[in-house]
Regions:
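Bacterial N-terminal signal peptides that target proteins for export
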Residues: 1-9
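Glycine-rich catalytic cores of cysteine/serine-nucleophile enzymes that process amide/ester linkages
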Residues: 25-95
Length: 190
């Protein structure tokens, strides 16, 4: 009798767990890459997880860059594109901060990425629409305060550190632990 009751309770508990919604969330990470070797300074984001409301999971980076590198970028607007950074590039970059997005914030981030993907060409401007501007607009879509200070718009790391400082309380409340802020990830994806 006792075994039957235990089995029945275990089965009911299992059914409750199976019918409960799974906890899922999309995390956004903001990365920078410094000048060195063949690398230009760069900023990009990484999205990983699944929306709480369901939908397909995401595990992808997004950065804004020139379509073709040439001296023309120094003279004025050139063709620009949103691209996915290779895993090897992500692994050699510095994650400045990560936090969980609500489904609403996630939708706004995706809309911003889509907007920048469909900008009329030429869309990249070193002074008005570069990778730092892109991650700044994504950060705003994610609900962060952003100051587009001219002296930081060509300095990805400094810009992201300024965004992190402006939003320290928000980042702490939304799941970023102090130890995770500004640390590198292992060689695998975030």
């Amino acid at each position: 009798m006792y075994r039957s009751a235990v089995f029945l309770l275990a089965a009911l508990f299992g059914l409750c767990l199976a019918s409960a919604p799974a906890f899922a969330a999309v995390e956004i990470s903001f990365y920078s890459r410094e000048l060195g070797g063949n690398n230009f300074p760069h900023a990009f984001i990484y999205l990983k997880g699944q929306p709480d409301s369901g939908g397909p999971p995401i595990d992808k980076s997004f950065g804004f860059t020139v379509k073709s590198l040439s001296p023309a970028v120094l003279m004025g607007p050139v063709g620009g594109k949103v691209m996915n950074e290779p895993d090897s590039y992500v692994a050699k970059s510095v994650r400045q901060f990560t936090f969980r997005l609500t489904d609403e914030q996630y939708g706004a981030v995706l809309a911003t990425i889509e907007e920048w993907s469909n900008k009329p060409q030429p869309s990249y401007s070193l002074n008005k629409a570069n990778c730092v501007h892109f991650v700044g607009k994504v950060a705003q879509a994610a609900g962060l305060r952003v100051e587009f200070r001219k002296e930081l718009m060509k300095k990805p790391r400094s810009f992201l550190l300024a965004v992190k400082a402006l939003n320290a309380e928000v980042l702490a409340r939304s799941g970023t632990t102090p130890a995770a802020i500004g640390t590198n990830l292992p060689q695998s994806r975030p």
